[in-house]
């Protein structure tokens, strides 16, 4: 980055500081990951210069013959990974992928069934502060108060009562496997479309470690980062009968020119996900999450639903007398990055919360193993039990420093 350093030292310095943060801290934010250098090279390529409104073979600009190759590669590889008859890789984000599906099927005011945000859903699944909750009549389902797992009978009851035009499945803070076949069964009973947002678990689906929603859904949306370990972006998978409508909803519906450098990076990441070692990576993510959960439980920290089936753990901090806001700050102070998160039936506000959400996708990419999860779990417990003890906090920092030194990140950058 010598050119950037000489041309704009302030931006260069900020980038280097972020590189240092990623190297020197333990990244446990469940929606984050570390992409390969090949993905970064594709995203920083000359494709950033090319405007390409439209789709391969049907562009509104000339000179698109090479970006067409890239977009076709991304679409074909996504089909090979997930199945599905049609793929659109142009959404700039998961939120825009969801928006495109809504615009394809729904009219203003239509009723939709979506997961309550505080129970693990997502802003775009009907939050009243989001376009989805403003534009449409979302009815919320949640988890059972005792098991803290999705109550499928409640979903069925609500579907029969409200007769939604669409049911949205998928979550941003739900640590258990979701039964997409059951959701489709319920959708069919009331004549609703089923959309699955698999953003968090897409990498696990790609590795064959979570039920694939594509055979059960009318529409599947996802981000291309998180467990899929690609660039930040979105994607839609659907049957051929909806292909033209979906494509039209993206362009010209809600976007103009696609980000061809990002689509190239998506293609590279999808190519990586097709390799045998990606399944090993997914298996390691789940092993690490389970081991970390076991260690935290042994340290007396409560987990929502008692554990995990995927990459994600949701910690209930009420027994420690802490809020998520305090815990996030304390952990960041010792070098562990997390995010405060609501838990089901949370008495605190979303700005404070009673929980934190953690995930193992990034630390697994870094090479950390189950033994390291024991150390991370012990360090989290040490921190959360001693937020006002400077000596113990210093000990936690030293343990983080030892781990990050043992597992270097991006040594060639």
UniProtKB/Swiss-Prot annotation:
Residues recorded with modification N6-(pyridoxal phosphate)lysine: 226
Pfam family, one: SHMT
Substrates-to-products reaction catalysed: (6R)-5,10-methylene-5,6,7,8-tetrahydrofolate + glycine + H2O = (6S)-5,6,7,8-tetrahydrofolate + L-serine
GO terms of molecular function: glycine hydroxymethyltransferase activity; pyridoxal phosphate binding
Subcellular location: Cytoplasm
Cofactor: pyridoxal 5'-phosphate
E.C. number: 2.1.2.1
Pathway, per record: One-carbon metabolism; tetrahydrofolate interconversion; Amino-acid biosynthesis; glycine biosynthesis; glycine from L-serine: step 1/1
PANTHER family, per the entry: SERINE HYDROXYMETHYLTRANSFERASE, SERINE HYDROXYMETHYLTRANSFERASE 1
Assembly notes: Homodimer.
Purpose of the protein: Catalyzes the reversible interconversion of serine and glycine with tetrahydrofolate (THF) serving as the one-carbon carrier. This reaction serves as the major source of one-carbon groups required for the biosynthesis of purines, thymidylate, methionine, and other important biomolecules. Also exhibits THF-independent aldolase activity toward beta-hydroxyamino acids, producing glycine and aldehydes, via a retro-aldol mechanism.
Name used for this protein in its record: Serine hydroxymethyltransferase
UniProt source species: Halalkalibacterium halodurans (strain ATCC BAA-125 / DSM 18197 / FERM 7344 / JCM 9153 / C-125)
């Amino acid at each position: 980055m010598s050119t950037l350093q000489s041309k704009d030292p302030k931006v260069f310095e900020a980038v280097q500081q972020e590189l240092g943060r990623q190297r020197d801290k333990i990244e446990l934010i469940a929606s984050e990951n570390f992409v390969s250098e090949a993905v970064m090279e594709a995203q920083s390529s000359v494709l950033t210069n090319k405007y390409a409104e439209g789709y391969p073979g049907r562009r509104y600009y000339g000179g698109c013959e090479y970006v067409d190759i890239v977009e076709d590669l991304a679409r074909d590889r996504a089909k090979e990974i997930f199945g599905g008859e049609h793929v659109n890789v142009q959404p700039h984000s998961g939120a825009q992928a969801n928006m495109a599906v809504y615009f394809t099927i729904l009219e203003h005011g239509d009723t939709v069934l979506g997961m309550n945000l505080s129970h693990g859903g997502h802003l775009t699944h009907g939050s009243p502060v989001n376009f989805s909750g403003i534009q449409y009549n979302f009815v919320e389902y949640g988890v059972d108060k005792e098991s803290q797992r999705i109550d499928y009978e409640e979903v069925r009851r609500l579907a029969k009562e409200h007769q939604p035009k669409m049911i949205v499945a998928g979550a941003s803070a739900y640590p258990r496997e979701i039964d997409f076949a059951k959701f489709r069964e319920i959708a069919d009973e009331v004549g609703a479309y089923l959309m699955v947002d698999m953003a968090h678990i897409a990498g696990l689906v790609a590795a064959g470690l979570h039920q694939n929603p594509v055979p059960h859904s009318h529409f599947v949306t996802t981000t291309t980062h998180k467990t899929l370990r690609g660039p930040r972006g979105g994607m839609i998978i659907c049957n051929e009968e909806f292909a033209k409508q979906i494509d039209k909803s993206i362009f010209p519906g809600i976007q103009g020119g696609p980000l061809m450098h990002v689509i190239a990076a998506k293609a590279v990441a999808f190519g990586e996900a097709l390799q045998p070692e990606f399944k090993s990576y997914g298996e390691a993510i789940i092993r690490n999450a389970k081991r970390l959960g076991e260690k935290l439980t042994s340290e007396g920290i409560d987990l929502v639903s008692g554990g995990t089936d995927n990459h994600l753990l949701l910690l209930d901090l009420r027994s420690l007398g802490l809020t998520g806001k305090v815990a996030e700050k304390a952990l960041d102070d010792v070098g562990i990055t997390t995010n405060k998160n609501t838990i089901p039936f949370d008495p605190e506000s979303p700005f404070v919360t009673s929980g934190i959400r953690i995930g193992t996708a990034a630390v697994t990419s870094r090479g950390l193993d189950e033994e390291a999860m024991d150390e991370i779990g012990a360090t989290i417990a040490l921190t959360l039990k001693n937020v006002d003890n400077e000596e113990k906090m210093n000990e936690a920092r030293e343990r983080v420093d030892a781990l990050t030194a043992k597992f270097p990140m991006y040594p060639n950058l």
